[in-house]
Amino acid sequence: MEGKVYIGGEDYEKEFTPKDYLTTYYSFHSGPVAEQEIVKFSLQNLYQTFSTGGVGGDVLIDIGSGPTIYQLLSACEVFREIIVTDYTPQNLQELQKWLKKEPGAYDWSSIVQHACELEGDRSRWQEKEAKLRRTVTRVLRCDVTKTPPLGSAQVPLADCVLTFLAMECACPDIDTYRAALRRLAGLLKPGGHLVTLVTLRFQHYMVGPKKFSGVYLEKEVVEKAIQDAGCQVLKCNCVSLSYSEAYCSHDGLCFVVARKGPSA
């Protein structure tokens, strides 16, 4: 195992391997129970948010999508357009592979089936995949440490900004995290929703043999950063679920839904 700890955008661009990340954390039926339970927790909260929770609209921007699509499986039913983003070209390439059904694309079918089961019909998973592929209209580079985070790309203000397990990895310290959340709030329409999943008390995680670090966050810090970005916290679901110790050092997860104020 390598002794070096990687942190920040340039390290991700050089060292992050999407396939290693996907096989470690998203091998839904063959992987460790802890990782499966976190995917189930994520899908359940997303389903509630985008069905009975009433979050929907025209445009959703997913910030720091990584190489994953599971976080969009419920959202594609209630948004007209989804924009996916990431810092690293290799993650964007992995997303494009799946969107275009190219050879070697990651097989999400078991996770898609679980999402469909939550909606009441496991058998419509292929229809769900097709709908998501139609709904994702753009794949963009993002850097949450810069203003604007989407660079020169022209995007409409969003009804929802989603960011899952990304900000704590992209930000090396709390000040950077707080500034990044303000930038994300700037992508929202007044009254739009911010939906995020955060690993609490995060120290590092493994991608293959490589160790990546980020910012250590407590629940109170997350809530305060969201409020200071001009958003009201509507739901904060913190649980003691954690990844396998061999893969990730943290203590719990926090799923938050917030709404941007009328004048933020």
UniProtKB/Swiss-Prot annotation:
It is an enzyme of class 2 (transferase). Detected in lung and liver (at protein level). Pfam families: NNMT_PNMT_TEMT. Inhibited by the S-adenosyl-L-methionine analog sinefungin and by the product S-adenosyl-L-homocysteine. It catalyses: a tertiary amine + S-adenosyl-L-methionine = a methylated tertiary amine + S-adenosyl-L-homocysteine + H(+); a secondary amine + S-adenosyl-L-methionine = a methylated secondary amine + S-adenosyl-L-homocysteine + H(+); a primary amine + S-adenosyl-L-methionine = a methylated primary amine + S-adenosyl-L-homocysteine + H(+); dimethyl sulfide + S-adenosyl-L-methionine = trimethylsulfonium + S-adenosyl-L-homocysteine. Its EC number is 2.1.1.49, 2.1.1.96. SUPFAM superfamilies: S-adenosyl-L-methionine-dependent methyltransferases (SSF53335). GO terms for cellular component: cytosol. It is found in: Cytoplasm. The modification N6-succinyllysine is found at residues 14, 97. Keywords: Cytoplasm, Detoxification, Methyltransferase, S-adenosyl-L-methionine, Transferase. GO terms for biological process: amine metabolic process; methylation; response to toxic substance. S-adenosyl-L-methionine binds at residues 21, 26, 64-65, 70, 86, 91, 143-144, 164. Optimum pH is 6.3. One of its GO terms (molecular function) is amine N-methyltransferase activity. It comes from the Eukaryota. Belongs to the class I-like SAM-binding methyltransferase superfamily. NNMT/PNMT/TEMT family. PANTHER family: INDOLETHYLAMINE N-METHYLTRANSFERASE, NNMT/PNMT/TEMT FAMILY MEMBER. Catalyzes the N-methylation of tryptamine and structurally related compounds. Functions as a thioether S-methyltransferase and is active with a variety of thioethers and the corresponding selenium and tellurium compounds, including 3-methylthiopropionaldehyde, dimethyl selenide, dimethyl telluride, 2-methylthioethylamine, 2-methylthioethanol, methyl-n-propyl sulfide and diethyl sulfide. Plays an important role in the detoxification of selenium compounds. Monomer. This is Indolethylamine N-methyltransferase. The gene is Inmt.
